[in-house]
């Protein structure tokens, strides 16, 4: 094959692993990636919801997995590489809001569960992705962690969730630093008030609790627009990295959450 023929070959599609792909931002992002030509590995605990996200696409691979279980995570990434040969992007999206209430009312079980999903699960998936990204040829890849506005400023009575999202920020920075020699980048998207079931559950239909003790219905924006921001980060050239991106609904309370 001559050089001219090689230069006109179409590069293979990129492969992305998306956790929490059965609903909300994860589902919207998976569909955006599929529309953009990615091969997408859909991970989550509920297979039926993952299949609904995939909608029969031949470029989608459904892998039911609990990101808090190390063996599930290893199986997820082995399945991704087995099906598509490599991992170019990980969107660490799965998370839980956890319990609400004053920290003195927070049980150790609820605290540990929130950390297990939002921090340990994120770490386990990143670690598995990095191992494969180091080993593959060409080496490298991109990790995008889903943080939150709570990584900047908390909602009232959300100590566990807020602590985990600050931890994700630290993890993002460490992964990005340590990945440099291997062509692995890591960035974080902090999304405020995308219209998802998680957002709808805040306040139990009575509006979100504000810093002054009142409740108010807050602005929201479509999950598909959040997904477009994730796709923007994932589509950056290998020479660039979007380290941090904050995307909120226009008019959403931010500083002091009031």
Task: Name these PLM-found stretches.
Residues 22-24:
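Conserved glycine-rich cofactor-binding loop
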Residues 36-51:
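Conserved glycine-rich Rossmann-like NAD(P)H-binding loop of the short-chain dehydrogenase/reductase
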Residues 65-76, 108:
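The beta1-alpha1 cofactor-binding region of Rossmann-like NAD(H)/NADP(H)-dependent oxidoreductases
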Residues 101-103, 110-112:
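Substrate-binding pocket helix/loop in short-chain dehydrogenase/reductase
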Residues 126, 164:
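Active-site helix of classical SDR
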Residues 148:
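Residue(s) in the substrate-gating loop at a strand-loop-helix junction
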Residues 184, 188-189, 208-255:
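C-terminal helical subdomain
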